[in-house]
Amino acid sequence: MFNKILIANRGEIACRVIKTARRLGIRTVAVYSEADANARHVRLADEAVLLGPAAARESYLVADKIIEACKRTGAQAVHPGYGFLSENEDFAEALAANGLVFIGPPAAAIRAMGSKSEAKKLMGAANVPLTPGYHGDDQTPALLQQEADEIGYPVLIKAAAGGGGKGMRLVERSADFLDALASCKREALSSFGDEHVLIEKYITRPRHIEIQVFADTLGHCVYLFERDCSVQRRHQKVLEEAPAPGMSEARRREMGEAAVAAAKAVGYVGAGTVEFIANQDGSFYFMEMNTRLQVEHPVTEMITGQDLVEWQLRVAAGQPLPLKQEQLEIRGHALEARIYAEDANKGFLPATGSLIRLQPPGESLHVRVDTGVEAGDEITPYYDPMIAKLIVWDENRDAALARMRQALADYQVAGLTTNIDFLSRLVACPAFAGADLDTGLIERQRDFLFPAVQPVPRDALLVAAVGELLWEQHEARQAARNSGDPWSPWHARDGWRMNLAAARSLSFKDGDTLIDIRVDYRADQWALSLGGSTTLARGRKLDGDRFAVELDDRRLIASLVAVAERRTVFLQGGTYTLLRDDPLHRVDAGDSQGGGLTAPMPGKVVALLAQPGQRVEKGAPLLILEAMKMEHTITAPTAGTLQAFCFAVGEQVGDGAALVEFVAEA
């Protein structure tokens, strides 16, 4: 076994590998960019080496720097995690050339599976079922369109070197093909350095089922059963589970044996995942093989009781697989939800910012949290916006779903927008709860998953007011203690006014709605008036930002996180955001809107889709912004004239930067 390994990655997967390595007595070396100098994986590792600037292409993707870090620290092997260089055959070969072990498959296997078109040919020869499609080398747009027309729409255009949902476009009709092809090629070139694409028939209501395989250097290969990853947004997984609901033993064996055949066809070693598209009639087709550990590997660990990172380390050290196929068994059901900094109501737009509060549910036999961040850390635009993976396990799917619902309700994040509320709706969705799964579930269930924005409920508003009053009292006491006259009445925050009732107003904004709560101070409580009715309230600070609240005869526990004027209320599993409004600083914003469209996040302009001076209709695409390795099309908010672009192709833009000068039609 190794004495020291280097982890060529960051975030939660680096922390995950460190955890197992530490248990096995293996020392770890972290690598980091300037943006990650204080990251959790750097703090957890025994040693850490700076690679370079924040941009991945100048740090985490520079193989020579990683090899040099190995030499400087004496690391014997490199665990690539997932993403970055994990599926780069040149990196694997470079490590071997420098006497270092790549904790992953042979370079030849990565190369064989790295090209989707080549992989399809190999799988066909190994009798692994294939989807109808075009996997040829001729990339002439006219030929590709002809092939798509012959396959029949809908078709899926996929980057041949792709993965992770990037470089994929669904095309419903021939007229849209060339635009989708151009966009797909741009994204493929940006993400993978290769614009080669393939085309496949798109199966209506498919399920995405993948098989975890493992092979050693002694010729043994097993499958550790399946994961259902059908719930996706933008072709990226959101919620995964194992085993797949409704999977029969016969079908599980058939898919598992097909996955093992796929692995053996390329001389595979280590952890790999063979992904299949499964039809509603029970047929299944090879999609791709990911030659690395998957993000969702924890659900497999939970149902098998195996540590897959330990398996990786043992196999890379030349040891045999820990178990044979007949020794592996499924126990219970596991679910994994990916907690992202993103706004589900804005097309899952990635978010950035500081994790002012980060309180995951407590871990136990049933609940696991894999994360690479802690409270106070920043989610930056440079890397994937994942905050954590929330994994639950129980004896059956219904019990696991109940665990997930509670764990999501207990998850508290403040400082930026997350998808936690969306995930809560997803696990409560009747279609998901009933295992009516396919990759279009989120789109099919839009009405349930994306309800109209509701106003912050009355209880949350009253709790916010109580939290504000308690905080004011706390500040007043602190000021009194620190003053030369602690008994001065001027320190009191009790609403006292000469010759008037002790009362005041607290003002908040819920979106664009202004909310005034009248506070009447009583001897040991407040009378809070809102919307024509009055509630008697008491409050008592607990630990941190938690406090106990009494609203008439009801007792609640809540938290209030305040950053500048932003207030985040955590109450009974819900998260509510308000702005503290100061009447003395109100301005009329009615005419403050400029004539430009702003960047929803930091990114790079990759295409301009209109001409200055051109009249456009509402929804017309104006430009494409690339952020976090995804393309985002900026469209006209209304009919009008594009006056000018503020940036050229290739230029970086900041969050909120004006992108175009636009004049709306009257």
Question: Model features per residue range: what roles?
Answer:
Residues 1-274, 278-297:
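N-terminal beta-alpha lobe that positions the nucleotide/phosphoryl donor
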Residues 587-666:
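Structured functional modules or segments
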Residues 323-331, 446, 450, 574-599:
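Long, charged amphipathic helices and adjacent flexible linkers at domain junctions
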Residues 3, 166-167, 243, 384-390, ...:
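Short amphipathic alpha-helical segments
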Residues 77, 87-94, 336, 346, ...:
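Structured, non-catalytic alpha/beta "coupling" segments that mediate domain-domain communication
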Residues 307, 520-546, 550-556, 565:
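Conserved nucleotide-binding/hydrolysis modules and their immediate coupling elements
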Residues 259, 298-533, 651-664:
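Catalytic cores of soluble metabolic enzymes centered on carboxylation/carboxyl-transfer
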